[in-house]
A protein has these predicted regions:
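Active-site-adjacent substrate/metal-binding segments within catalytic domains
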Residues: 1-77, 86-108
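Active-site region of glycoside hydrolase catalytic domains
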Residues: 97-177
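Short, glycine/charged-enriched secondary-structure capping and boundary segments
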Residues: 58-60, 83-84, 123-126
Length: 177
């Protein structure tokens, strides 16, 4: 729903425009956003394996009515979510939520790209359980702490009206019972 009206999201996964970021001009950003508009898209997902985009990207999405599914920059891996690294992750999330929260285009914050899928669907869980069950449990608990506790708390505290989704793709796989 958007402003009380049902919305069907039509969009694409957005990755950085160039591996050399300074080569991306404002005109290039505008072309990409207008290409989405002209393709009848209304949403772009900022991929968690990329970057938090420049303000011009979000300003153009605001201007042209493109909703943004904003991934946090965690992708296709497990991260030792404890101690100083977990605090660094938290601070990065706070900084980016605060920076982007006033953009009306931000429709959703998403914890990561494919980390749960990798754990359950790509066989990481079985692999780690076979190697060392205690280590597998530690990894899973850290994943839960990061994507189901810490990041949703950051979003709730810093952008309380925003939606949060733990991972993309996401299905329960029975793991949260």
């Amino acid at each position: 729903e958007l402003n009380g009206k049902p919305v069907f999201a039509k969009g694409a996964n957005y990755i950085p425009n160039d591996m050399f970021l300074p080569r991306v001009s404002n005109a290039k950003y505008e072309k990409v956003i207008l290409d989405a508009v002209n393709a009848n898209m209304n949403m772009l997902r900022v991929w968690g394996g990329g970057i938090y985009e420049n303000d011009i990207f979000y300003n153009l999405c605001d201007k042209y009515g493109i909703m943004v599914w904003q991934d946090f920059m965690f992708a296709c891996s497990v991260y030792p979510a404890e101690g100083a690294l977990l605090e660094n992750m938290r601070q990065e999330a706070i900084e980016n939520v605060r920076r982007l929260r006033n953009h009306p285009s931000i429709a959703l914050w998403c914890g990561n790209n494919e980390n749960n899928e990798a754990w359950f669907g790509w066989g990481w869980k079985k692999k780690y359980e076979k190697q060392n069950p205690k280590y597998a449990e530690l990894i899973w608990n850290q994943l839960v702490e990061q994507y189901h506790v810490m990041l949703p708390k950051v979003v709730k505290e810093n952008d309380p009206e925003a939606f949060y989704w733990p991972t993309s793709p996401f299905s329960e796989f029975g793991q949260l019972s």
